[in-house]
Structures are given as C-alpha cells and as structure tokens.
Design a protein with these regions (language model features):
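Short, charge-rich amphipathic alpha-helical segments embedded
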Residues: 122-151, 257, 262-266
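Residues that mark the junctions of alpha-helical repeat units in TPR/alpha-solenoid scaffolds
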Residues: 88, 95, 135, 219-226, ...
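Tandem amphipathic alpha-helical repeat scaffolds
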Residues: 102-108, 140-149, 181-198, 227-242, ...
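Intrinsically disordered, low-complexity protein-interaction/activation regions
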Residues: 1-111, 147
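Flexible helix-coil transition and linker loops at the boundaries of alpha-helical arrays
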Residues: 86-90, 125-129, 170-174, 211-223, ...
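Helix-turn-helix repeat elements of alpha-solenoid scaffolds
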Residues: 73-77, 110-120, 153-163, 194-213, ...
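TPR repeat positional signature
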Residues: 92, 99, 118, 134-135, ...
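Short helix-adjacent coil turns
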Residues: 17, 63, 106-117, 126-133, ...
C-alpha cells in the first residue's frame, strides 16, 4: 500500500508564519515528545518529494511501521490544530466562527448571558465582513438565547426583528450563490472551449451574459453578488471583444471593492488583479 503523503502536503502548504507558530508551541511540550515531532517535521520539510523510506531511515524507525504511522498521524493532527489556532488569532473570518462555537458551548451549559457576549462578537465580525453563511448560524443562536430568556417581554419585542434578520441574510446568501453558479458556468465554458473566438463559443458566452441576474445590477443583493456581477460581465464582454462594456464593468468592480473596503478583508490579491484587468482593457 502506498504511504499517505497528506502530512507532506500539509507541511509544504504552510507559510513561514504558520511554521514558526508550530515550532514555538511545540517546544513547550515535554522534551522527548517535542524532539520526536520536530525531528519528523524537519525531515519531511527538507524533502522535495515525499520519500517515506528515507524519512524512516533518518528517524531510526525502519521496520517500525505502526509506531511511525502513529507519529505521523499525531503530527498531522497537531499541525492542523496549530494552523487553525493561528488563523483564529489572525483572521477575522476564523474568529467569528470560533466565537460562535464558544457561544454554542456556553449556551449548552445554560449560561445564556455569557453566550450572548460571544454571539455579539461573532455578529460584529461577520456583519462587517459580509459573511452571510456564518451570519445564518449566528442569528439563529442569538434568537435561541432570547427564546430561552426568562424575559418574555424582551423576546416578544425582538421576535419579528430576529426572524426578518435571518430571512434577509438567507436571501443575500442564496442570491450570492446564484451569482457564484453563473461564475462557475462561465469558468467551465472557458476551460472546456478550445477556441473562444469561434462563433459557437461566443454564442455560449453570450447566453450566460443574457441571464436576468447579469442584465440588471440591482439584482445583485449583496456585496459579493455585486462583485460577481461585475466580474462575470467584465470577463464575458472581454471575450466577446466588446472592450467598452468590459471596461465599464471592470471599472465598476474596482469602485465596489474600494468603496466597501474589501481590500482590507483579505482581498488585496483580488483587488490588484482587478486593477490589472482594468488596465489591460483600457490599453
């Protein structure tokens, strides 16, 4: 049976900062355990391709398949935990989910007041970053806390508000998913077409661009829907060699991203790419 290279792929995917985070926290373990895990980590990290036989030899674990498998599995789970914790501390999207998880635990332990504090933290982050799917769970947990509150009057006053809040974010999420599907359709057409200038290919692109959601910008009900609306049209009309329309949509995409400050929420790469596409169209 071919040895799994999952651990190798995970280590190779790690950034310098993630590796430092792992090393610092691993050194806090007992000396023997820390030495084993770091030795295996270093042995795998030094490889260009995964060669389990040479790694076992380097670790002095030739013929100890079961023990080596346990060490690999422990290191993999440990790395995944460290990477997750690192991103929970550095990325707001992860923090929102972590706060919601904490709120769920506190609510299950019948500590609604404490749970509410973490729901508010999660909600603030998710709303700021337009995390619609996260907000569905956050609003639901918030409604549960109010529902089980002894303050019946307060629950009665907020019942409609919570329902409408949940309904609005579900609608935004579904609307965004429709635009994502259209984006996937366009990408699939591009990937499976040898000659995009061929009349048949142009007809396929045109058919996608004639979808009702792509004909009216007011149909895009969320920030990400607006981004997809302009992205799809910008690319589509570029393929159809309609540079005026392509430029218009790409310029609008830049304006949307900049006005919503999405470039500060982990989208700097997308923003720079959009600026490049706009420049190419303009030239």
């Amino acid at each position: 049976m071919t040895p799994s290279n999952d651990l190798f792929e995970l280590i190779k995917s790690m950034t310098r900062e993630e590796k430092i985070h792992f090393r610092v926290h691993t050194k806090g373990l007992t000396k023997a355990a820390s030495k084993n895990y770091l030795a295996l980590f270093d042995a795998i990290e030094s490889k260009t391709d995964y060669d389990e036989a040479s790694i076992r030899k380097k670790m002095g674990m030739v013929g100890k398949g079961g023990k080596f498998a346990v060490l690999k599995n422990y290191l993999y789970n440990s790395l995944l935990t460290h990477v997750t914790n690192y991103h929970c501390a550095t990325k707001e999207a992860y923090q929102a989910r972590e706060y919601l998880r904490m709120a769920n635990v506190l609510f299950d332990k019948q500590l609604p007041a404490q749970a509410s504090k973490y729901v508010k933290k999660a909600k603030s982050i998710a709303e700021k970053n337009h995390r619609y799917l996260d907000l569905i769970g956050i609003y639901f947990q918030e409604e549960l806390i109010y529902k089980n509150s002894p303050d019946i009057k307060k629950y009665s006053q907020t019942l409609d508000k919570h329902f409408n809040q949940e309904l609005a974010v579900i609608t935004q999420y579904l609307n965004t998913r429709q635009y994502i599907y259209l984006d996937c359709q366009l990408l699939n057409t591009i990937r499976t077409t040898d000659n995009l200038s061929h009349p048949d290919s142009q007809e396929k692109i045109q058919a996608i661009l004639q979808h009702p959601l792509l004909l009216d910008e007011n149909m895009a009900m969320s920030l990400y829907a607006q981004i997809y609306y302009n992205t799809i049209n910008g690319i589509g009309y570029h393929i159809l060699a309609d540079d005026n329309k392509s430029y218009s949509y790409r310029k609008q995409l830049i304006d949307v991203m900049a006005s919503q400050m999405i470039i500060t929420a982990g989208y700097i790469g997308n923003y720079i790419g959009s600026l490049h596409n706009l420049t190419v169209t303009e030239i």
